[in-house]
């Protein structure tokens, strides 16, 4: 209970997803369609070497170079910094700004799941332009993933717990997937100066 209280963000409580592990917030229309289109243009205009092909997705890494001793920080591009500032303004990181972004692209039929895939305890519907916030046990104790599918079928008897916030979550709906682009915005607490990384 104490962990849940520490993870709660009072200003986001209207967006809390009930009947789900604590604490999950789902904010529909967090960005506008115009902002979405702008971000997508910038993502797909990124230099080809910026993309890394992984199993079931493609990835861009912005904000720093991962290293066992810490992250070597890099300045975020202005087009991405605006979105990062908007998330940081929610006070998700103890008043500190986010400093790292992973951009993931999933084609229809692609996904990423833990191996072996566990029995899911909940499943959410994430619509375009929305923001999903995982805190507390939902972030520290549970794995999360995206099922590799081309169509998502909503069970009328068991709708996703955030269905009330999703205009496409009609009972029995068949939702055909398009290309999915997601931004994982986070704060990496341990960063290094380049000189420290190179020192003995």
What do the predicted segments below correspond to?
Residues 1-200:
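Non-heme Fe(II) oxygenase metal-center motifs and adjacent flexible, charged/small-residue loops
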